[in-house]
Amino acid sequence: MVTLINCFEVPAGREEEFFAGYRKVNAYMRAKKGYVSNKMHRSLARDATFRFVNVVQWESREACEAAHDAGFRELIAQPALSSVRSTPALYEVVHEATA
């Protein structure tokens, strides 16, 4: 299992536009082989650099890479998303703790 973490710099006043675009991408990705789960986080601080942080789990690195295909690239080319800076990277768990 791998985790894609993507932080988004969304300009003030563009949150709803961004989130509408994100929902389209999420619907597309959820149908992809190897998709496990997704959580989109929104900062409680309105002046945070990264207003949104997306955490997506995939069965494997290969599944994640295969899902980022031409259809995905077409969706993220829409102005609501293409004008937003993002920092995607894949991560593996190196430590986990629970209460």
Residue ranges of model-derived segments:
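An amphipathic, aromatic/His-enriched active-site/gating alpha helix that lines ligand/cofactor pockets
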Residues: K24-V36, Q57-E92
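Short, well-ordered beta-strand segments in beta-rich or mixed alpha/beta enzyme
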Residues: V2-E9, K39-D69
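Short, surface-exposed ligand-recognition loops at beta-strand->loop->(often short) alpha-helix junctions
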Residues: V10-F18
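Glycine-rich beta-strand-turn "strand-cap" elements at beta-sheet edges
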Residues: V2, K39-F50, I76-A99
